[in-house]
Regions:
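Small-aliphatic-rich amphipathic alpha-helix that forms the alpha element of a beta-alpha
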Residues: 44, 63, 93, 135-158
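N-terminal amphipathic, basic helical "cap/leader" segment at the start of enzyme domains
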Residues: 1-133
Length: 158
């Protein structure tokens, strides 16, 4: 748990510091996927075998788009591919790779640099075989995005 607390501190530090601007990596358009949803669901399996081969940006952006991307085009691209309570967008997706920790920013399709340390082994806890996976996605609930709204909502109910 200490390692997770360290990551929380890293993330809090990232949010607390506005300057200097963190380096960003723009990712390509996700592109069309060739498999139907039915086929994807039929082929879905859990596996404990992980390759350490890097994931190319084209595949990574497709995974991130499915995990928390924007659907639609142009001005209509304001809805997430995943549900969010009252459109609060309270969950952030962090990409943990050998070259550090990055925040996924779906509105701009970029990875924003957070921390330079390779933290992948810190997320294995009871599954050490996971540490060789080239990418870990970490979902972080940002309570600050909902705190005031939840208080207002609770007051209306009472």
């Amino acid at each position: 748990m200490k390692r997770i607390d360290e990551l929380k501190d890293i993330i809090k530090g990232k949010k607390a510091t506005e300057a200097p601007k963190a380096p960003e990596r723009e990712l390509p358009e996700p592109g069309d996927m060739s498999m139907s949803l039915t086929e994807v669901l039929m082929r879905r399996r859990s596996s404990l075998d992980f390759s350490d081969a890097p994931i190319c940006d084209e595949d990574l952006v497709r995974i991130l788009w499915a995990a928390d991307g924007l659907n639609g085009k142009g001005n209509n691209a304001n809805h997430r591919t995943t549900p969010t309570t009252l459109n609060w967008k309270e969950i952030d997706t962090y990409v943990v790779k050998a070259n550090g920790v990055w925040l996924w920013v779906p509105e701009r399709r970029v990875l924003s640099f957070v921390h330079e340390k390779d933290c992948r082994k810190d997320f294995c806890l009871l599954q050490p075989m996971v540490k060789q996976a080239p990418v870990h996605l970490v979902y972080v609930y940002d309570q600050a995005k909902t705190q005031g709204l939840m208080t207002d909502l609770a007051m209306q109910i009472v």
